From Swiss-Prot:
GO biological process entries: phosphatidylethanolamine biosynthetic process
Protein name as annotated: Phosphatidylserine decarboxylase proenzyme
EC category name: lyase
InterPro entries from the UniProt entry: PS_Dcarbxylase (IPR003817), PSD-A (IPR033175)
Lipid biosynthesis in keyword set: yes
Membrane topology value: Peripheral membrane protein
UniProt superkingdom: Bacteria
EC number(s) per entry: 4.1.1.65
Main subcellular localisation: membrane
Disulfide feature: none
Family: Belongs to the phosphatidylserine decarboxylase family. PSD-A subfamily.
Gene Ontology molecular-function annotations: phosphatidylserine decarboxylase activity
């Protein structure tokens, strides 16, 4: 299954167009060196909003990474959004990571819940419960098991975008949201899920398997 989205995220088109137009105008009036700082800004905008194709593993028990970044949490804890004990795996995104968020599994959106909050460094544990965040509870299509994905805003990222609704059916690797300029995604899994990543490991959205969750009969 191929990733069916453009190479530049749609969220970035207005920013990229604005930066490019201003750079061209300054280039015309002040020359290359005068416009160089603006061209550098344009390149930064281009790299930030990149959204490259990714391979999507097809193993039925695979729970995929919802975002690019670095693993900062692998632990047993409470899932406050689905009201259960869970295995929590958190992915921290810095400003240089791709910031599209993609579904970790095939399933139905059972619950969406937005929480206003603070904007502390998303690399800190307390960001999970104190920062602005958006929780998506998904019931797996194959066996009804629940996985919760939580978009968490960060110190710089202050805009969470989510494009799905309760009742929507998601496919693994499907793009469902975006967080601008540094953030994290928390994944809550059933406690019998087997993590495939460790703290400090770098992961790629859709391409990296976070954990194995056996299909129940």
């Amino acid at each position: 299954m191929n990733y069916p989205h453009p190479l530049i995220a749609r969220e970035g088109w207005p920013f990229l167009a604005g930066a490019f137009i201003v750079s061209v105008l300054v280039h015309i009036s002040a020359g290359f060196w005068g416009a160089l700082p603006l061209w550098i800004v344009t390149l930064f905008v281009l790299q930030f909003f990149r959204d490259p194709p990714r391979p999507i593993p097809s193993a039925p028990n695979a729970i995929l990474a919802p975002a690019d970044g670095r693993i900062v949490v692998v632990e047993k804890t409470q899932d406050p959004y689905a009201g259960r004990e869970a295995l929590k795996i958190s992915v921290f995104m810095n400003v240089f990571n791709v910031h599209s968020n993609r579904s970790s599994l095939d399933g139905k959106v059972e619950k969406l819940e937005y929480f206003p909050g603070k904007f502390v460094n998303a690399d800190l544990d307390k960001a999970s419960m104190e920062n602005e965040r958006n929780a998506v509870v998904i019931r797996r299509a194959s066996d009804g098991q629940v996985v919760t994905l939580v978009q968490v805003a960060g110190l710089v990222a202050r805009r969470i975008l989510c494009y799905i609704n309760v009742g929507d059916m998601l496919s693994r690797g499907q793009r469902y949201g975006f967080i601008r300029f540094g953030s994290r995604v928390d994944v809550y899994l059933p406690t019998d899920a087997r993590p495939r990543v460790t703290i400090g490991e770098k992961v790629s959205a859709s391409a990296t398997v976070l954990a194995d969750l056996d299909v129940r009969a």
